[in-house]
């Protein structure tokens, strides 16, 4: 395409079109244009040049000669940059570049038909042999002549869409991720205080076999205030024979704790991810260990925690002959064997995050003395302990394993730990508090 217009850059702002015509008097040009824009001032407006110019010549040969002679030449105190003008072409619409959706489907269908017939799908280079092939690769693996039978068999396995179904990006793999459960729904935008009992009551007409509730953590960054909220969601497995679409349609508009919620069919791969995370969390909680002196305390399942919790209680309370520890889920009673020594300097914190007990050492327990020690043959139902500083606090997380009656303990303030070798102050004016530990269940 022949172009008879040139583009001149770095033109002086003080140069006019008449000055440029005088500069180009040795060439056969037809028009000179210096584009400008209006600068608005307080009292009047001014026209300011863009620093460029366009010159039209009588022929393309004359334009080429002007570019060769004028490029790099000085005009108005500036060195000019001259080149041929490139006409502006707007970008093509997306439909023209890639075709409509129907054209794309037909193009891919052509590859599928040729692959099913055993022939190699035509490429763009085969359709247009004059154009070089750029950025296109055939989906098949083609081996050159002289290959062995094993290599050819390997190529057939790679090309086989059935054996290569698990490859990432294939339709089979994508369909697995988008598979929807037939009995589990995903409930979003639940109230913060939602419990499993609330969800059971909500789905009482359809039955709930399994419920998974999970919550997101708050974002403390003030720049993202829209994320600073508690998002609670749940996966509920229903036992009804109705299809999920029918269940969702019937529950449309029904509120949970006065709040509208969103119910959708759950993806199967999301259900598997939640169950996998729950299993890993349970294993970590089971294997959690806390070192206390020379012994390791392991809190496992609720049945194992009953025996382990007695060892923990014996280490914390000190040298006491026996304490009744009850499991309220069963009638079994475990006795704590006599142990010597006190708790170490490291406070005992949460031992199990889900299933069992939480033991907290508020300070360094002082020496404890027994009152009214019973005979060995007499069953011990209650132990009174005296302490002058701090106390012991055992708290049940879910089903209580250790039962403690704190009603016998008077009000006290938790202060800083005192050194063990510090002399005891006189008991004048000091209140001696009693800690009553009793069993709330009877055997």
Swiss-Prot record:
Alphabetized PROSITE patterns for the sequence: RRM
Residue ranges, compositional bias (Basic and acidic residues): 121-133
CDD domains in the record: RRM1_RRT5, RRM2_RRT5
Region: Disordered, residue numbers: 112-140, 408-443
Basic residues composition bias: residue spans: 417-427
SMART domains recorded: RRM, RRM_1
Stored InterPro entries: Nucleotide-bd_a/b_plait_sf (IPR012677), RBD_domain_sf (IPR035979), RRM_dom (IPR000504), RRM_dom_euk (IPR003954), Rrt5_RRM1 (IPR034244), Rrt5_RRM2 (IPR034247), RRT5_SRSF_SR (IPR050374)
Keyword set, alphabetical order: Repeat, RNA-binding, Transcription, Transcription regulation
Gene Ontology MF term list: mRNA binding
One GO CC term, this protein: nucleus
Record-annotated RRM domain positions: 4-87, 183-268
SUPFAM superfamilies: RNA-binding domain, RBD (SSF54928)
Cell membrane found in the keyword field: no
Entry keyword Transcription regulation: yes
General function of this protein: May be involved in the modulation of rDNA transcription.
PANTHER family: REGULATOR OF RDNA TRANSCRIPTION PROTEIN 5, RNA RECOGNITION MOTIF RRM DOMAIN CONTAINING PROTEIN
Name listed for the protein in its UniProt record: Regulator of rDNA transcription protein 5
Species per Swiss-Prot/TrEMBL record: Candida glabrata (strain ATCC 2001 / BCRC 20586 / JCM 3761 / NBRC 0622 / NRRL Y-65 / CBS 138)
Gene name of the encoded protein: RRT5
